[in-house]
Amino acid sequence: MELKVIDAKGQVSGSLSVSDALFAREYNEALVHQLVNAYLANARSGNRAQKTRAEVKHSTKKPWRQKGTGRARSGMTSSPLWRKGGRAFPNKPDENFTQKVNRKMYRAGMATILSQLTRDERLFAIEALTAETPKTKVFAEQVKNLGLEQVLFVTKQLDENVYLASRNLPNVLVLEAQQVDPYSLLRYKKVIITKDAVAQLEEQWV
């Protein structure tokens, strides 16, 4: 499998031989869906909470007498039927949203994502990703010269200048190869991977 390599102007300047197992795998939509759902679920903090009818602030006084008013009977204002009443089945902070994905499935899922991105010409390789200064304006111009709007850069080791220059750009994300996740790969329109990061991804997932 050959992966297109682009230069500093975003033009295809060559190709890089890559593993078919990682970049030429058949697309598995169900597996990708499971991976993304698991990633988003595991990112949840799980701190949402509502109060039960015993926890809301209320009076224990009966709103009106049991019979004779013509209205529905009511015991207290903390009932879930009442405005500002407690929830019948409230969410609690100890709720666990963790979803487990086996290592074999995760590797297969990442491979199918990378393969589909390559087929859709959304994934390219680049010689290296560097920045002379930690200036956002300079790095933004560099990204613009590549002809990119919304892009994920993947490097083997994150350069400090690149990190500082890119962190305030809303449509640019820079990750190390070991940090790459399925959601980020699919979220951005283009994915640019440095050559040494490609080698590391092959070592991790093949």
From Swiss-Prot:
Pfam families: Ribosomal_L4 (PF00573). InterPro entries: Ribosomal_uL4 (IPR002136), Ribosomal_uL4-like (IPR013005), Ribosomal_uL4_dom_sf (IPR023574). Belongs to the universal ribosomal protein uL4 family. One of its GO terms (molecular function) is rRNA binding. Part of the 50S ribosomal subunit. The keyword Ribonucleoprotein applies. Keywords: Ribonucleoprotein, Ribosomal protein, RNA-binding, rRNA-binding. GO terms for cellular component: ribonucleoprotein complex; ribosome. Residues 46-95 are annotated as: Disordered. This is Large ribosomal subunit protein uL4. Residues 59-70 have a biased composition (Basic residues). One of the primary rRNA binding proteins, this protein initially binds near the 5'-end of the 23S rRNA. It is important during the early stages of 50S assembly. It makes multiple contacts with different domains of the 23S rRNA in the assembled 50S subunit and ribosome. NCBIfam families: rplD_bact (TIGR03953). GO terms for biological process: translation.
